[in-house]
Amino acid sequence: MPIGVPKVPFRLPGEEDAVWVDVNRLYRERLLFLGQQVDDEIANQLIGIMMYLNGEDETQDMYLYINSPGGAVLPGISVYDAMQFVVPDVHTICMGLAASMGSSILTGGEITKRIALPHARVMIHQPASSYYDGQAGECIMEAEEVLKLRDCITKVYVQRTGKPLWVISEDMERDVFMSAEEAKAYGIVDLIALETS
């Protein structure tokens, strides 16, 4: 568990005294957090929690708060797929940064329930290869796999934003950073949270 995760009082049914736990209370409230780079561990954790909450109650929505620089493509796609699989709607809320796979996951929230905080930033780009050293055949196979993943992510953005394929493909050629307003206009989020005074 990362440093800085708050401990909250949580009382188990039938117990008199509450105990201080880290995030179990938040999970029971159906609040999930992606506050780091996407990797196998955090993806498996999020998917496991979503599946558990889906089995526990299919009528209550889940809320996924995102502040992520992105990360590995396959774990990110698995989180996206899990969000589409579960019965409850998954609200996605961008706080800070949703870059790379973080923005793909943000886009995967239930349409009309994707939110960005006023000063949030979103970034899209194409997936990169991590395989630079090896035999030519291995590099070619890796390049083919990266192209398949790029096609998959492009289709996700096309489906979830309503933008034409050529626009998404062109924009993914480089890092495209967006403000909350620009992300809304692009179709990655549907709402911008209001500042309270």
UniProtKB/Swiss-Prot annotation:
GO terms for molecular function: ATP-dependent peptidase activity; ATPase binding; serine-type endopeptidase activity. The keyword Cytoplasm does not apply. It is found in: Plastid, Chloroplast stroma. Its main location: plastid. Keywords: Chloroplast, Hydrolase, Plastid, Protease, Serine protease. The active site is at S100, H125. It catalyses: Hydrolysis of proteins to small peptides in the presence of ATP and magnesium. alpha-casein is the usual test substrate. In the absence of ATP, only oligopeptides shorter than five residues are hydrolyzed (such as succinyl-Leu-Tyr-|-NHMec, and Leu-Tyr-Leu-|-Tyr-Trp, in which cleavage of the -Tyr-|-Leu- and -Tyr-|-Trp bonds also occurs). SUPFAM superfamilies: ClpP/crotonase. Its EC number is 3.4.21.92. GO terms for cellular component: chloroplast stroma; endopeptidase Clp complex. InterPro entries: ClpP, ClpP/crotonase-like_dom_sf, ClpP/TepA, ClpP_His_AS, ClpP_Ser_AS. PROSITE patterns: CLP_PROTEASE_HIS, CLP_PROTEASE_SER. Cleaves peptides in various proteins in a process that requires ATP hydrolysis. Has a chymotrypsin-like activity. Plays a major role in the degradation of misfolded proteins. Belongs to the peptidase S14 family. Component of the chloroplastic Clp protease core complex. This is ATP-dependent Clp protease proteolytic subunit.
